[in-house]
Amino acid sequence: SYEKGSGTPIRATEGTVLSRIPPRMKVRRNAPIELPHIMVLIDDPQKEIIEPLATDKAKKEMSGVYMTSLMERGGRIAAHLLSKKQAEKVEDQLAALGDPQRFAETYHAEGKPVLVYAMGDGNHSLATAKACWEELKPTLSPEEQLTHPARYALVELVNLYDDSLEFEAIHRVLFGVDPKKLMADFLAAYPGAHYGEGEGHQITYVLPGGEKGVVTVPNPTAQLEVGTLQTFLDKYLEENGGKIDYIHGEDVVESLVSQPDSIGFLLPSMTKDQLFPTVIFDGALPRKTFSMGEAHDKRFYMEARKIK
């Protein structure tokens, strides 16, 4: 489910903008094939499921599908079809990720619904595929529902701990605000919040003129610093006005905070072991928590599948 706070085994990691789905459904309804890029993450820090398949020994059991060079510094790509034995092993390993006891122990999440697959990219594409299927399902017989190609979506399954997957922080810059009032309101919003380092969430601010400092929020209710900050900023902007920009790179933040009515916040990069717990306990990541990798590392649209 792409609904916020859902307890399904496959979940969105960020809020789904429902207004984005109908225009996409309009395109998908009449499309005979899909060429999506939907990245779904599994939490496999020991690298036991996908990585062993990339060895030369494992590839000898597979049949080649294609091999080609790519444009725009994309390098080369080769695709292989798993043998029946390999595919069955992967299915068993993925099923084991959904074991309730393993889940509860791994995440200290006794009583929480099991999360197996977390959306990494293409959340709205998968949400559209799901919405189209729900629309089509009542028009099919139970037998047709079992085998109809629109029941499934083509996804790229990626280990969260894949070395090529790099999380980069997204910082905040606000314009058209009074920095002194904003900081005073921030401290007032969280009991015990104070200037300087301490126990809890530490958030770095940048004032006009380049002055930097740290605010500590003790006993935070959110899993991540960005959650603590974004909850406050959303409320502040709603009540006081102003504009927010989401920025990559600390140096860019510092150069933008040059006007007297601006302020910047530098956030730490989310670590990989924080992603699943945050979705499990907070329901979703705060908006613009992180970006994944550089543009030239992103996946090319290579595979298509029939959906009619």
What are the roles of these predicted feature ranges?
Residues 1-308:
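Surface-exposed, charge/polar-rich loops and edge strands
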